[in-house]
């Protein structure tokens, strides 16, 4: 999905900033395909194409229902991408659904500001 691509590029750019080098990013992909082998191949191709510099896992088929099963602690997953922010104890402190990419102008700028402020706060804990 285009928003997933934009989010991946954004998170990869964060990993290049000194402030966020210690942040651990992990992607759980929900992919189209007839079976998990096909889905995993699609996910690996995506990771190679993007030059992914953080870990990735297959969550299952591309559906919000499947994502809700995998992330059963949430009250549901309603869109892709959905980002979970965890503290150092591994507790979910914030969930963000969707992604306002560069094409959204000021909305992308605001997303960057709020995301980076949250990450700085979590790193200080």
What does each of the following model-derived ranges do?
Residues 28-31, 57-61, 87, 96-99:
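Active-site-proximal beta-strand/loop segments in catalytic clefts of secreted hydrolases
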Residues 51-55, 74-84:
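Structural micro-motif
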Residues 79-125:
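Thiol-/selenol-based redox modules, centered on thioredoxin-like
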